[in-house]
Regions:
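Signature of extracytoplasmic/envelope-associated structural regions
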Residues: 1-345
């Protein structure tokens, strides 16, 4: 029958979270599949210990090797869509409020980082990776450590998630792999980029050249092992969360506003609103909006892109008293309320 090709692979996902760490999402809830832009290579690499350095053997060679701990990691790469963004931000932030929009077929999902006073355990989900009829693996207890989103005027917007699992990587009994979801792409020309003081942001979309956003949970992977854990991670908690935002702006002839904002440490707000021309229904389009209501510049170096002069701007996102956080993401799509982060039972 020959060997397996990369393009034969499929991945089953779920919008739902596991009911508990160590309890997989049920097969009836593993019904989602998203278009990925790169092969999702599951890194299953147990920590090994051998006796190569042990004294007294009379030679330099190892005579035994044992698995001490299990570990899994996975990277998922997507074009930015309302479905890929909602899936990743749900498990990245761990908190969502969803509402139906005026009896339409559209739903608004507002994602914010969960309050660590309530829980520090990241929500976890399960995935199934099928590479052939003889290779179908369940990845259990997958927590999302980091999401990065990038966009330039020349390319589609991309979004990537970096996952960390318990180390469980076993055979799956999922009978049928799901079909890919049809989801409109959110491109660079779908982005409205607003920048300015809070509530007075100005559209700078025509000046924007590139955009890089990331949010990390600093997941405490090594701290998740226990004496009674038989080598598997038993929890995955938040460490010290960190967010970055960098973007490029063309330099105007009549203004040095970005340098002025750096030296004055002006409190600024950024709204990045990707709005698709494809509608969920007659009223509401697919969209992803990222709001950072309080930030300051940390650097505004000059750059030359081709023949055009601009700024490469680096920022420090900060806590906002009104939001009671530092970032909020709103996604509009056709996924009903009470779906994202619902417990699989």
């Amino acid at each position: 029958m020959g060997t397996v090709r990369e393009y034969e692979g499929q991945m089953a996902l779920s919008w739902k979270k596991q009911s508990a760490y160590g309890t997989a999402v049920t097969n009836t809830d593993l019904i989602q599949a998203l278009r990925m832009t790169a092969f999702p290579d599951a890194d299953f690499k147990p920590d090994m210990v051998n006796d190569e350095e042990v004294f007294g053997k009379g030679h330099e060679w190892a005579t035994e090797q044992n698995i001490e701990r299990f570990n899994t990691a996975l990277k998922t790469d997507f074009d930015l869509t309302s479905h890929s963004a909602a899936f990743l931000f749900a498990f990245l932030f761990g908190n969502v409020v969803s509402t139906q929009l005026e009896e339409s077929d559209a739903y608004s999902h507002v994602f914010t980082p969960m309050a660590i006073a309530t829980t520090k355990q990241l929500p976890v989900t399960s995935m199934v990776q099928q590479l052939s009829s003889g290779f179908k693996k369940l990845l259990r207890d997958m927590a999302l450590n980091e999401v990065s989103l990038s966009c330039s005027v020349k390319d589609r917007a991309k979004i990537t998630g970096s996952w960390i699992g318990s180390g469980f990587y076993g055979d799956s009994a999922l009978a049928t792999m799901p079909q890919l979801i049809t989801s409109p792409y959110l491109k660079s020309d779908n982005l409205q980029f607003k920048l300015g003081t809070k509530a007075s942001e100005v559209d700078r979309s025509t000046d924007l050249t590139n955009l890089d956003f990331s949010f990390s949970n600093d997941a405490l992977g090594d701290e998740g092992y226990r004496f009674d854990g038989d080598g598997y991670r038993r929890e995955c908690e938040i460490g010290k969360r960190k967010m970055t935002l960098k973007f490029g702006l063309r330099l105007a002839h009549d203004s040095d506003a970005e340098h002025d904002r750096l030296f004055a440490q002006t409190a600024l707000s950024v709204i990045m609103d990707f709005v698709s021309p494809v509608m969920v229904d007659e009223t509401y389009p697919h969209s992803v909006k990222i709001e950072i209501p309080n930030l300051a510049y940390t650097a505004t170096p000059i750059k030359v892109d081709g023949k055009v002069v601009g700024h490469d701007i680096e920022t420090l996102p900060m806590y906002d008293e009104t939001l009671e956080g530092a970032v909020q993401v709103t996604v509009v799509n056709d996924v009903p309320e009470d779906t994202y982060l619902a417990a699989s039972v």
